Structure formats: C-alpha cells, structure tokens
C-alpha cells in the first residue's frame, strides 16, 4: 500500500471530513442522562462493551464484509443487513446520514463512484476501490469511532483532556482484538448483545433536553 493510500484514509476518517460525526453520540448521551455512564471508569466500560458486543464490533465486521465483496448485489445485501441491524431509528439515521455524506464527498473529490451506503459499508467499499489495506482501515475506523465517543464524553461528563486520551489509549488492546475478529469473520458472525447501549439509543429519541442527534 502506498503512502498516498494511507493519507487518503487519514483524510476520510479525520474529524474535518464532512460526515457530521461530531453530532452523534451512539446513545452515549442517553446513557449519561440515565446515570449508566457517570465518569471516566464507566465510560471505559461502555466503550469496551461496544467493542466486544456492540456497535463498534458490528461496524468493523460490516466494513470488512463490504471490503471483501466482489459484486454490487452482495454489497447491497450487506448494506441492507447493516440497516436492518440498527436497533433504533436514531442509530439508523446515524449510519445512514454519515454514510451518504461520506459517499457524496468521496465521489466529488476522487471521482469514485459510490452508491449511497451506510457508513461502515461505504468506508469498506471505498477502501477496496482505492487499494487501502483492510487491516489499517479497520484499525483507523475503530479509532475514529472511539475518538468521537470520547470527545462526546468530554462534553457530557467531567472528563479532562488528559484523562480522555488515557481512556482512549486504554482501548487499544480490545480494539486490536475486534479488528482481528473482523478480519477472520463473515456476515454470519454478526451479532449484537450490548443491550444497555441499544436501549439508551431508543430512549434518547424522546429525551427532553439533548445536544446530540443520537
């Protein structure tokens, strides 16, 4: 893989790339509101659960499946699965709108023909089309996923900048295990068992006061 491909991936997953990731908390705001996430320790537990049983794990597997698929039909099936797997309306909106924004921006800059796809499926498909290595794509996608939630945690909790980075760094071993599972997994390995996160995202839809869209 060339350094140009690496730089392209870095740009795609940069906070400056206009997908609107900053507006979504993946249900974290609901969890904070209900007292499930209260401080740095409980935030770390929440992120670990997402990597092991929740949205981070399923996103990684969907990304890898999209990367490996060779036909438009199978890509569409993976994207349909990604949509069906969303546990709430806001989580569907989160992946749908970010994916659509990613596809529009990437097509406009690199003239890469991309249908409107959910976010992890779009990133996986774009990485394949641009010869970006799958393992690096998975590592950087999950790091960006976690970074966005840590940043959300800083806005929702009494969490300083240094501790926030310590919490993010501590996710490294579990992140790598999640990547390894995605590299060896298939769509049949897709599951979700992060029920607290799913319920938090559902309850967030009717939360009275909020700053995030999910």
From Swiss-Prot:
InterPro entries: UreF, UreF_sf. One of its GO terms (molecular function) is nickel cation binding. GO terms for cellular component: cytoplasm. It is found in: Cytoplasm. Keywords: Chaperone, Cytoplasm, Nickel insertion. Its main location: cytoplasm. Required for maturation of urease via the functional incorporation of the urease nickel metallocenter. Belongs to the UreF family. UreD, UreF and UreG form a complex that acts as a GTP-hydrolysis-dependent molecular chaperone, activating the urease apoprotein by helping to assemble the nickel containing metallocenter of UreC. The UreE protein probably delivers the nickel. This is Urease accessory protein UreF.
